[in-house]
Amino acid sequence: MIGTDTSHVIAFTKSFNGPPGPNHVEGARVVAAYKGGSPDVESSYTRVDKFAEQLKTEWKIEFVDDIAQLCPKVDAILLESVDGRTHLEQARQAFTCGKPVFIDKPLASTLEDAREIARLAREAGVTWFSSSSLRWSEIATTLKHEDSTGVLTWGPGPTEPHHYLDLSWYAIHPVEMLYALMGPGCVEVTRTIGKTGDIIVGRWEDGRLGTVRTQPQSWKYGAVVFRPKGVEQSHPDMKSSYTPMLREIVKFFRTGTPPVSNEETLEIFAFMDAAQKSKEQGGKPIKLR
């Protein structure tokens, strides 16, 4: 495990290393970690030591001084650092281990870094994937239909000033849900800025429209799926947990086959990059690059 500055490290370790129960995930154990941390990101420097200590005392996780020392101790790597800016350099080092890597959200803070991570992995012959757990939420799995004509998703949208792609910090969750429901194929994005949230509209190559509504002051997620003969909407009691994603991670570590293609993940970042440029240009439609 790389990076102990996110609550995910505690939740994931409980699921992998904890006793049998509804959220227990068989097939993997967290055994060693590198602390990491970012001194200029509040949610990192205020938590990195606390979570590291919790992993040591409650779960007896061994800590190492650098990523190279992690390599011989593990069979696969969870790159968990909360700061997406650190992922490129940490992934560069992790790939030298030659072992499969899961990179937690956000994959990176820029499209360029995301593409460079993918290039380095290809060069090293290492398999990887990155995703939000919302891809496997009841919202995304229950409402997915092959005949959908369009999708609207919504979710929290707080930002972090050091992340150029502001959607990557937290709105990655509703963006990931959008792609889970729509599939890849977006060609153009338009973003409208509002006082209480933004609306990001993607036009797919087949003419469908996929929309994300950010809600900075709300922690609720949802979706509406448009179909030829009606509309389906999520309801508030639909559940979301890390467990389905963790099971996919274990399967990926064993098979080397990512549950989300690297190409789709990179398109998600191209979508967010186009949304950022649309915002900077006053809502102008921007083609994905």
Protein language model regions, located:
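Short helix/strand-capping hinge loops at secondary-structure junctions
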Residues: G98-P100, K105-P106
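N-terminal glycine-/serine-/threonine-rich beta1-alpha1-beta2 phosphate-ribose binding loop
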Residues: M1-C97, R119-E123, K279-Q281, L288
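A contiguous active-site-proximal alpha/beta segment in oxidoreductase catalytic domains
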Residues: L107-Y164
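Hydrophobic residues in well-ordered beta-strands that form the structural core
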Residues: D65, I103, W128-S130
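Rossmann-like dinucleotide-binding domain that binds NAD(P)(H)
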Residues: W154-K220, E263-L266, A270
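Interdomain hinge/lid region at the active-site interface
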Residues: S218-T257
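C-terminal helix-rich "cap/oligomerization" subdomain common to oxidoreductases
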Residues: I77-L78, R254-R289
